[in-house]
Amino acid sequence: MQIKPFEDRYRDDLIFMVLEAKDALGRVPHINDDLLEIQKSYFDKGDRFWIAVDENDRVIGCVGYNRIEHTNEAFLHRLYVKASMKHLGIGTALLKEAETAMRQNGIAVARVHLGEPAEQWFESYAFYPKHGYRLYAPRDMLKELKG
């Protein structure tokens, strides 16, 4: 597995992976608008977005973040791992990549919205606390990023 910044040539494979991941969670698959224009939604704003690819250069995971204006905080977005590749450390590796970049860019607090209903997003509610995140609202967690 390799984690690298998103490139447009991976767009369709990324979209397919996200739709598959949502379907595996019992969600009606749809694509969020930001995933259709990652350059505009992330990079053009000074934010970041990564993909994890396997040995065949296929997308198996992703994560991004957007800084919250006029703060030293950012929201994590779109942490997905291909359904057949969960529990192999890919999500943890992607999260660490994002947190490291946030720290390097002066971001002190990472926030994440967990989705609803909680029953469908149960993996998020279990995953983030294992990595130091805590609830600050019914469906939102945060983590203070230490240097």
For each of these PLM feature ranges, what is it?
Residues 1-2:
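Extreme N-terminal starter segment of soluble prokaryotic enzymes
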Residues 5-77, 82, 95-96, 101, ...:
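Acetyl-CoA-dependent GNAT
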Residues 53-55, 144-147:
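Active-site beta-strand termini and strand-to-loop segments that position acidic
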Residues 82-88, 100, 116:
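Active-site acidic-Proline motif in GNAT/NAT acetyltransferases
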Residues 86, 111-124, 142-146:
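Conserved beta-strand-loop-alpha-helix junction that forms the acyl-donor binding cleft
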Residues 92:
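Residues forming the Rossmann-fold NAD(P)(H) cofactor-binding site
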Residues 95, 102-116:
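Conserved GNAT acetyl-CoA-binding A-motif
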Residues 128, 133:
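Conserved active-site tyrosine of GNAT-family acetyltransferases
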